[in-house]
Regions:
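Functional transmembrane core segments of multi-pass inner-membrane proteins
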Residues: 36, 127-235, 271-279
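Interfacial loop-to-transmembrane junctions
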Residues: 235-261
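Short, positively charged and aromatic/hydrophobic N-terminal segments
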Residues: 13, 21-22
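Transmembrane helix-loop-helix
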Residues: 117-129
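Select subsegments of transmembrane alpha-helices in polytopic membrane proteins
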Residues: 99-107, 152
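Long, highly hydrophobic alpha-helical transmembrane signal-anchor segments
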Residues: 23-55
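Membrane-proximal soluble regions of multi-pass membrane proteins
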Residues: 47-102, 251
Length: 279
């Protein structure tokens, strides 16, 4: 028997005993981050399927993953996130066709985001809702970059899931959740009406989904950051001549970036801003 347990019979005065015996679901911070990183790799592999199949109107469940060049089914040992791509040197085992680097990139991105969320939020219910939002944002980013669309099949259920999750965790915060949806979607509705359709309805629904998860304060931070990032990139495109004024630039990835920053560091940014200018 561990002598430390004998010397400390009272549960209240023995933190190590409490952690190991009375609260087994609590993980040390590093273990939680590592666990979320591994979960993120697996989720990222699934998101690759979502990014490819949803725009094509295909099922994300069946058939199993296959090589896009030859159609050969991908065996489980060739479908291990990141590692299989490295082992096969980015090629299909059957036909040796090149497999895009985007597949491991999406897996790694999702894993890193999940680990960051674990570090920032810890073992809380908020972490669960954060992981759902991050997964949706990664999928939306990939689809918008490829097809310049933000699928309703992700954003509309996302509004419901975000609202229900937040209301379940904090029933007293219902006003913040509803205001978040109204602010996130309403700002883009105003832009759409004012510009005569200069911005798509997908951005409006994405804004509403972000608001459902983040609440009205953090969704404002997310939108401001997204607009700033999008403006910087647009200026870069125009100055280098790589895109003209009328060339479409998907805005979803910039909103997703703003939402990620707001989710992970938004409260700190708000506290800094309010203290700096109004403190």
């Amino acid at each position: 028997m561990d002598p430390s347990l004998v010397a400390c019979p009272a549960p209240v005065s023995c933190p190590s005993r409490n952690l190991l015996l009375y609260n087994p679901v609590v993980l040390p911070p590093l273990s939680l981050e590592a666990t979320c990183f591994l979960v993120g790799l697996v989720v990222g592999s699934f998101l690759n399927v979502v990014i490819v199949r949803i725009p094509a109107g295909r099922s994300i469940v069946r058939p199993p993953s296959a090589c896009p060049a030859c159609g050969a089914s991908i065996r489980w040992y060739d479908n291990v996130p990141v590692l299989s791509w490295l082992w096969l040197r980015g090629r299909c085992r059957a036909c040796r066709a090149i497999i895009s680097w985007r597949y491991p990139a999406v897996e790694l991105l999702t894993a890193v985001l999940f680990a960051l969320a674990a570090r920032q939020l810890g073992p809380t219910l908020d972490l669960g809702t954060a992981l759902l939002l991050l997964a949706a944002l990664v999928a939306i980013t990939g689809i918008d970059l490829d097809h310049q669309i933000i699928p309703d099949v992700i954003t509309l259920p996302g509004v419901v899931v975000g609202a229900v999750a937040n209301l379940a965790i904090r029933p007293e915060g219902w006003a913040d959740t509803l205001l978040g949806i109204a602010v996130g979607g309403g700002l883009f509705l105003i832009i759409i009406l004012a510009s005569g359709g200069g911005m798509g309805g997908g951005d409006m629904k994405l804004g509403a989904m972000m608001g459902a998860f983040l609440g009205w304060k953090l969704v404002l931070v997310a939108i401001l950051l997204g607009v700033f990032a999008g403006g910087v990139v647009a200026i870069g495109f125009l100055s280098t001549g790589s895109k003209g004024r009328k060339d479409p630039v998907p805005f979803g990835p910039f909103l997703a970036l703003g939402a990620v920053v707001s989710l992970l560091w938004g409260p700190s940014l708000l506290a800094w801003y309010l203290g700096r200018f109004f403190g």
